[in-house]
Amino acid sequence: MAAIGVLKVPPSSSSSSSSSSSKAIARNLSFTSSHLSGDKIFTLSGRTRRTSGRNPFIVSPKAVSDSKNSQTCLDPDASRSVLGIILGGGAGTRLYPLTKKRAKPAVPLGANYRLIDIPVSNCLNSNISKIYVLTQFNSASLNRHLSRAYASNLGGYKNEGFVEVLAAQQSPENPNWFQGTADAVRQYLWLFEEHNVLEYLVLAGDHLYRMDYERFIQAHRESDADITVAALPMDEARATAFGLMKIDEEGRIIEFSENPKGEQLKAMKVDTTILGLDDDRAKEMPYIASMGIYVVSKHVMLDLLRDKFPGANDFGSEVIPGATELGMRVQAYLYDGYWEDIGTIEAFYNANLGITKKPVPDFSFYDRSSPIYTQPRYLPPSKMLDADITDSVIGEGCVIKNCKIHHSVVGLRSCISEGAIIEDTLLMGADYYETDADRRFLAAKGGVPIGIGKNSHIRRAIIDKNARIGDDVKIINSDNVQEAARETEGYFIKSGIVTVIKDALIPSGTVI
């Protein structure tokens, strides 16, 4: 777990929830080298109601928060009846250069974690232990992380749990790579079909949020839906940037509109009290946007991708709207917690610095009822020598000497030298330590060791892993440049945020 600024850990808003707020079914989750393991005991609240015919009303819980404040009882339980499918995303061009050498879900997050840890942890905390991750681009680091972070046996029903990476591949039947989200799932339907489950849970690998998928699945079953789409309430200012949905009085989706404006936007207003918002919040948030998260009944998925839409490539723009037009029951499920699509450099930067927010961060890694799991690294505690650190999160194994750090996230194994000033910055840290002898040798030859050099000043920046920042460097973008590509010089500027490339060298005295 990361340390918080001035070594004071703020309490999570949901950390006060006790184990009594947890759910039904004792389960054991075992992680590699016993990094995070233990039993969670849950109390039954009654059997899930199932009906033989169509239920005329959607049974959707009130707006979902970060903590598990209600109980569920799936029958059969999620570990036996649900298969998690996490989509690794495309090439991640909007996140470049962070995706230059890694897949988007493998991008570091919050000092100690990676983006993929979010959906995997949400699955494990929701008793979903059979998980596939579909990837296509730069998947080596993602494969390595998942194999080290999650044991081959994750418990679950009959100890059959797993987290397995499926890379895009060519075959005699299909010589093409993944063409989109639906096509990626279609190409591996032969494998998914072998699992004796009721539903497929389709997730994105680049979202930051905490969600109880068991409640999501329960709403799907109780409404007798073919497909259930997770929906986020929106105000008018944000709504134009999303794909919006319109629902009827039963919460059934009847219309889709991508990035609507003007009169088209007004036409997409819905009564969000139907999905559980109170009257005041429903007035503030009269739109609902798709989160790109779906529960799809197994037989429906097979029918849609093989028979109804064999050429469709995308769930959001083709398969889901097509299912609605065919008259299938496509329901909306409201999620009203924190959610961020980490699709751009600016969104990624803001999401990371959001965890330093006072008094309660946008997203808390300190929620003991729903922990975020990751790879065990067995690093020593961070060492801070005469450092002035405020409103910051410090990862494991850092060495910080006589410097100032404010409103920043400092990743694992970071080395920050005397006199440095770090403000509003995300340091991703390093993959390895350099020995003292290595650093002395580099200094003697005029080289630059990994980390931040003496008297350097960094503000509003992202410093990727293993970067070498020399002495007296200024990365402050004093000219307020919004966009610049300086790959040969080791950095990019996007939305005014300077991003130093992984393994880059910024010589002493450089001003950016």
Swiss-Prot record:
Record protein name field: Glucose-1-phosphate adenylyltransferase small subunit 2, chloroplastic
Ranges where the record places region Disordered: 1-21
Annotated localization: Plastid, Chloroplast
Listed EC numbers: 2.7.7.27
SUPFAM superfamilies (alphabetical): Nucleotide-diphospho-sugar transferases, Trimeric LpxA-like enzymes
Feature: compositional bias, Low complexity: 12-21
GO CC list: chloroplast
Domain of life of the native organism: Eukaryota
Record-level GO BP terms: glycogen biosynthetic process; starch biosynthetic process
Regulation: Activated by 3'phosphoglycerate, inhibited by orthophosphate. Allosteric regulation.
Transit peptide residues according to the UniProt entry: 1-63
One Pfam family of this chain: NTP_transferase
The protein's assembly and partners: Heterotetramer.
Similarity section: Belongs to the bacterial/plant glucose-1-phosphate adenylyltransferase family.
Pathway participation: Glycan biosynthesis; starch biosynthesis
Catalysed conversion reaction: alpha-D-glucose 1-phosphate + ATP + H(+) = ADP-alpha-D-glucose + diphosphate
